[in-house]
Amino acid sequence: MPTWTEYILYKKLGKTPSPGDVVEIVPDLVGFHDLTGYHVLEVLESMGKVEVFDRERVVVAFDHLSPPPNQRAAEIMVYIRRHVKALGLPNFYDVGGGILHQIILEKYALPGQVIFAADSHTNTAGAVGAFAHGMGATDIAAALKLGKTWIVVPAPFRIDVVGEFPIGVMGKDVALHLLGQFGAEGFNGYSVEVFVETPKAFPMDDRATVANMSTEMGADALMFIPDVITAEYLKTERGVDYTPPRIEPGNYADKYTVELPRLEPLVAAPYSVDNIKSVREVEGVEVDQVFIGSCTNGRLSDIAVAAKILKGRRVKSRCIAIPASYEVFRRAMKLGYIDVLTEAGCVVTYGTCGPCLGGHFGVAGPGEVVVTTSNRNFRGRVGHPDAKIYLANPAVAAATAAEGKIADPRPYLRG
């Protein structure tokens, strides 16, 4: 039987390619944001007439430079808006709409689709079983113009997830565990397929986090095999009826099992995503700033656990909370989470990548220690190159904000 990757590529190509083959493929969806969009459109202009293969299959979002922190950012947005209007692109999300990857997951991605976008964390849509892959501006411009582009066919790698999450453990810890086991380049050239033994024990938000951070693992794509959770998500969020296919075991280059009950809250310590430690090993490190959000951990359940921990408390370090989209913010506000966070002393906005890339809305200074729920912690990622960055799940981040030092969230969640 074919793997899920082979199944998707067969539907597109009419044949089953071998790993390492170079193939041209027609995407179901193409995306870009403000930071990459400028370059995408420049390349598109250099190709002659500015046109796209299918306006309905293009998604554009302002997120990295949103709201514009300087004149140059504003100029870039004006340039992109002009092209969006001229091309008649209907799926455009201006300032405040949200982060591209979250928007694609919420509104567009479907199981079995092929999605390309001009950002490395396009993999996020793999949460619903889409083959989602980030590309550079030139390749995305070609895909927009021609309706196709090339990929090197990855080898399939199987991951089985068994058991249920212990208290205080989230999808972020699965991602960090895999980084600790395989390293930052461990899945280079692989399409990772995740089979969840107990689907209801692994919610969609956590799946999105793991898919998102597969970029840090070097994966070409990471896809959760569609199951009952996928079907429920699509029905609830989109009104789409979906019946998960029966997937029989295929031939995999390698495989690995994640035992959820054996995991504990983890962190990636400076300055590498695979410098993995238990939260107990770094507990007590004083922290200047906490960031809860990003395309990695800015979804509703992430905001919910932060609010649960911070309710009735005041933060002892600066804390910035950014739901990943307008929709997440709206729901969090309706459920009272935004009030809880602001009353705790957090600064809250939505729909921006600013702190994650060290661009604005929370840039770290020299020597500062930052705990963030985002996806990268190399030098200079969140600001000054001397800032120390720890990656953690939202529960760890919230407990850390409450104490002003890295803290284990489990006592807060048990209490």
Swiss-Prot record:
GO terms for biological process: L-leucine biosynthetic process. PROSITE patterns: ACONITASE_1, ACONITASE_2. It comes from the Archaea. It catalyses: (2R,3S)-3-isopropylmalate = (2S)-2-isopropylmalate. Coiled coil: none annotated. It is an enzyme of class 4 (lyase). Keywords: 4Fe-4S, Amino-acid biosynthesis, Branched-chain amino acid biosynthesis, Iron, Iron-sulfur, Leucine biosynthesis, Lyase, Metal-binding. One of its GO terms (molecular function) is 4 iron, 4 sulfur cluster binding. Binds 1 [4Fe-4S] cluster per subunit. [4Fe-4S] cluster binds at residues 295, 353, 356. Its EC number is 4.2.1.33. InterPro entries: Acnase/IPM_dHydase_lsu_aba_1/3, Acoase/IPM_deHydtase_lsu_aba, Aconitase_4Fe-4S_BS, Aconitase_4Fe-4S_dom, HAcnase/IPMdehydase_lsu_prok, Homoacnase/IPMdehydase_lsu, IPM_dehydratase_rel_enz. Pathway: Amino-acid biosynthesis; L-leucine biosynthesis; L-leucine from 3-methyl-2-oxobutanoate: step 2/4. Its cofactor is [4Fe-4S] cluster. It holds the Pfam family Aconitase. Belongs to the aconitase/IPM isomerase family. LeuC type 2 subfamily. PANTHER family: HOMOACONITASE, MITOCHONDRIAL (PTHR43822:SF2), HOMOACONITASE, MITOCHONDRIAL-RELATED (PTHR43822). Catalyzes the isomerization between 2-isopropylmalate and 3-isopropylmalate, via the formation of 2-isopropylmaleate. Heterodimer of LeuC and LeuD. HAMAP family: LeuC_type2. This is 3-isopropylmalate dehydratase large subunit. It comes from Pyrobaculum aerophilum (strain ATCC 51768 / DSM 7523 / JCM 9630 / CIP 104966 / NBRC 100827 / IM2). The lineage of its organism: Archaea, Thermoproteota, Thermoprotei, Thermoproteales, Thermoproteaceae.
